[in-house]
Swiss-Prot record:
Gene induction: Down-regulated in the absence of cap.
Lineage of the species this protein comes from: Eukaryota, Amoebozoa, Evosea, Eumycetozoa, Dictyostelia
One of the protein's GO biological processes: regulation of Rho protein signal transduction
One Gene Ontology cellular component annotation held by this UniProt entry: cytoplasm
Organism whose genome encodes this protein: Dictyostelium discoideum
Protein name, UniProt field: Putative rho GDP-dissociation inhibitor 1
InterPro entries the record matches: Ig_E-set, Rho_GDI, RhoGDI_dom_sf
Family membership noted in the UniProt record: Belongs to the Rho GDI family.
An example molecular function term from Gene Ontology annotations: GTPase activator activity
Subcellular location: Cytoplasm
Amino acid sequence: MSDNHEEESNVPAYVPGKHVSVDQLKQQDAEDEALKRYKESLLGTGVHAPKDDPRKLVIKEMKIQIEGRPDTIYPLDTKELIKEMKTKPFVLKESCHYKITLTFNIQHDIVSGLKQTNTVYRKGIKVSTEKHMLGSFAPQALAHSVTNPRHGWEEAPSGMLARGSYTAKVVFTDDDNEEHLSVEYAFSIKSDWKSDD
C-alpha cells in the first residue's frame, strides 16, 4: 500500500508489439542453427502444459514476507484455494515492513507485458490502486517468481485511522488486455501482532 496511488501521468505511452506465438517464433529463421539454439535457450524445446488446462497463467502461491516474522503462504493451485484466500486474512502490524512474492507458471504460449493491478478496499470504499509491471514470460517447466517491491520493503500504514480490516482484489492482465486471473484476499492492520483492534 504505497503512496503512488494511480499515478500514471508521468509514464510515457507504451504501445505493445504484435503478439507472436511460440510456434511462430520457432519457425522464423529456422535454417539458422545458432539462432535456433538461442531461441531454445529462451523459449525451451517444448510447451510445458497439460493439454486439458487452457490457462496461460497459473498462479501457484502468494507469499507474504514480513521482516522478522515467519512467512504466510497461500497456495493457489485450484479455484477452491483461490476462493478460500478471501476468508483467511493475514495480519500486518502497523509500520511493519513486508513484501509479497508471487510464484506462477506460464504455459502454452508467451505472456507479454504481464501486469498486476492491486486494489485495496476498506468498508467497501477504494483506498488505493497500485499497478506493477511483472514482465514478459515464456512457457517453461520451472515456476517464475516475482517479488514486490523488488528492492527493499513496503511499510504498512500506521495510526488509529489505518487500523482495521481490508479487502483487496488483484487482477493479472497482459498487453492484449486479456485477464488471466482475479484473486480477492483480506488482511488486517493492527497495533500489535496479537491485538483485536
